[in-house]
Structure formats: C-alpha cells, structure tokens
C-alpha cells in the first residue's frame, strides 16, 4: 500500500532557500541504506536521491529568501506550507503517512499540513520522524540534495566559497562579512531577518566609523 513521508532541509541557514520534499510509494520499495540525511556524505545522499527518484513519487517545494524574510509570516507557517506543497504533488485521496514535525505541538503541525493539501490524506506529524520512518528519511535525503545543489549554485554565482550557509559555519560568516565590507549591503541570497545578517551589517558599519 502506498504511503508517504515528508521532511525539509534548510530551515536554519542564513544563506539561501529552504526546501521541503515528499516521497510516496510502497515503503518496502525504499532503497536500502536510507538514513537521516545529516549523517550521510554528500555523495551518498546524491546516490540515494537518484535511487529514491527511480522507485518512488517525489515532490519538492522551495521557499526562497524573500518569503522567509516576509514579516507577515514565520518559519512554522512557511514549513507547513512547503511540506503541504511538496506533499500535494505526490498524494491522492485516502493516502496516509508521516511528516517531520516543525512545531513543538506535533498534532497541530500535522493538522495544518493536512488542511493545506487538496487531497484527503491522513497526516501524522512526529519529531524525529526521519529517524523512525524510511519514507521520511528518503524525503530528508531528497530535500537535503536539493538544498546542496542550491548552495552549490549560489557559490558558483558568487564565485566564492560560501560554506554550508549555516550561521555556525565560519566560512559562511567570513563570506557574508567580506561581501558586506565590499558592497555595503547583504547579498541577495542572505536572510536579512537573521541575526547573523544583522551582525555582519553592524560590524561593517562599526568598521566604517572606526576608519572615519
């Protein structure tokens, strides 16, 4: 019986989009070796992504920086919308499955996702679902590969090493600081509402004052 799994990647980075992925099909057809994408190498994720796409239905939704920075929304709402968008691409009435909960209240998150999908589906949201269910783990891989490709494209566009895009990554912070010093503004791929972006702008302003 076909079921589904949904997860997202890129909720926390200061650079670039967030991606959600939904995978639907027979759970028994999930490729061997699927595990939470964060524990796999990039090459292994790409290999499994190809195998998942060859054997399952896959939907991917992107949430760009301008939507993330919109003051009229929040990350929980955007995560619900992205998961529902991806899920709506692969499901039909009567299907059931699991999504990785992006809210402290799992039941509320699951209801919100289900309510945004046109098909009549049964959604169960759980924290850490990518560790428990192969279909969610497969969706985690697809979402992370989409995010990886996005970061690679950004690095190529800026002709620079931008790191992973996460605030904890020193390469990302160095790229952001250097860009702001040179251009006097954030790169378009930066989430301006993130504290890391504000810090980069503040440091550049302070440096300019010190030089004056």
Curated annotation (Swiss-Prot):
Gene3D superfamilies: Ribonuclease H-like superfamily/Ribonuclease H (3.30.420.10), Ribonuclease hii. Domain 2 (1.10.10.460). The keyword Hydrolase applies. GO terms for biological process: DNA replication, removal of RNA primer; mismatch repair. Keywords: Cytoplasm, Endonuclease, Hydrolase, Manganese, Metal-binding, Nuclease. It catalyses: Endonucleolytic cleavage to 5'-phosphomonoester. One of its GO terms (cellular component) is cytoplasm. SUPFAM superfamilies: Ribonuclease H-like (SSF53098). Residues 1-206 form the RNase H type-2 domain. It is an enzyme of class 3 (hydrolase). A divalent metal cation binds at residues 7-8, 100. It is found in: Cytoplasm. Manganese or magnesium. Binds 1 divalent metal ion per monomer in the absence of substrate. May bind a second metal ion after substrate binding. It holds the Pfam family RNase_HII. GO terms for molecular function: manganese ion binding; RNA binding; RNA-DNA hybrid ribonuclease activity. Belongs to the RNase HII family. Endonuclease that specifically degrades the RNA of RNA-DNA hybrids. This is Ribonuclease HII. It comes from Halobacterium salinarum (strain ATCC 700922 / JCM 11081 / NRC-1) (Halobacterium halobium).
């Amino acid at each position: 019986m076909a079921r589904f799994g949904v997860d997202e990647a890129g909720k926390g980075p200061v650079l670039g989009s967030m991606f959600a992925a939904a995978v639907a099909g027979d759970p028994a057809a999930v490729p061997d070796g699927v595990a939470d994408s964060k524990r796999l190498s990039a090459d292994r994720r790409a290999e499994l992504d190809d195998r998942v796409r060859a054997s399952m239905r896959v939907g991917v939704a992107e949430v760009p920086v301008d939507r993330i920075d919109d003051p009229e929304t929040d990350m929980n709402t955007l995560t619900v919308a992205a998961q529902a968008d991806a899920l709506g691409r692969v499901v039909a009435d009567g299907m059931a499955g699991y999504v990785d909960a992006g809210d402290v209240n799992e039941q509320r998150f699951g209801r919100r996702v289900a309510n945004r999908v046109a098909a009549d589906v049964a959604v169960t949201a759980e924290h850490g679902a990518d560790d428990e269910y192969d279909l969610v783990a497969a969706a985690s891989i697809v979402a992370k590969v989409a995010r990886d490709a996005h970061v690679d494209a950004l690095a190529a566009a800026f002709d620079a090493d931008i790191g992973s895009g996460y605030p904890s990554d020193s390469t990302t912070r160095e790229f952001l600081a250097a860009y702001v010093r040179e251009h006097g503004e954030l790169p378009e791929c930066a989430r301006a509402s993130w504290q890391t972006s504000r810090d980069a702008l503040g440091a550049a302003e302070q440096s300019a004052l010190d030089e004056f």
